[in-house]
Amino acid sequence: MMRALLCFVLGMLATLAAQGKPLEFQKVENCRWTANRWNDGDSFHVITGDAGREIVARLYFVDTPEAETAYRDRIDEQGAYFGITREQTVAIAHEAAAFTAKRLAAPFTVWTRWRSALGRSALGRVYCIIITAEARDLNELLVENGLARIYGTRTTLFDGRDSRKYLARLAELEAQAKREKRGAWRFVK
């Protein structure tokens, strides 16, 4: 199943590349976060406002820790980034998931190119940038609160900004979170 999905996605990308058409961002408004046991801080189920279909959104540019303890190597890698223990990393994972759910309680906007983020969901995951009801970038909120590391795939943003400038902005927010001992940074001596 996953192999077939991957082949399909790669085939679509190859077709678009052959046609010389870049994948443009699409704006999907009035989206709703929906509960699912696999939701975490950077990957979660969404009901789209346009067609009411369910997708799994995976944030571009950031990575929140895993709460599922079966992924020990990944948790250890994420903890090493922050300089914290496995237990602290899992605690931050739960905080990040709750933070995201709270921030997305009101309808929000999804910007996506419908690029596959792989993953284990039967729905498939697509990379997204999320703008909250308060017009805040969810990536920035997670990083400035010490709940996510700067990580993941890179792309030009929906508003045309270069990813290097955006990543520099995230780095500023991360430095501030470290100084103020927010989120995972509170555990660092």
Question: What residues fall within each predicted segment?
Answer:
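Bacterial N-terminal signal peptides
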Residues: C7-L13
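Small beta-barrel nucleic-acid-binding modules, primarily SNase/OB-fold domains
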Residues: L16-K189
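Positively charged n-region of N-terminal signal peptides that target proteins for export
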Residues: M1-L5
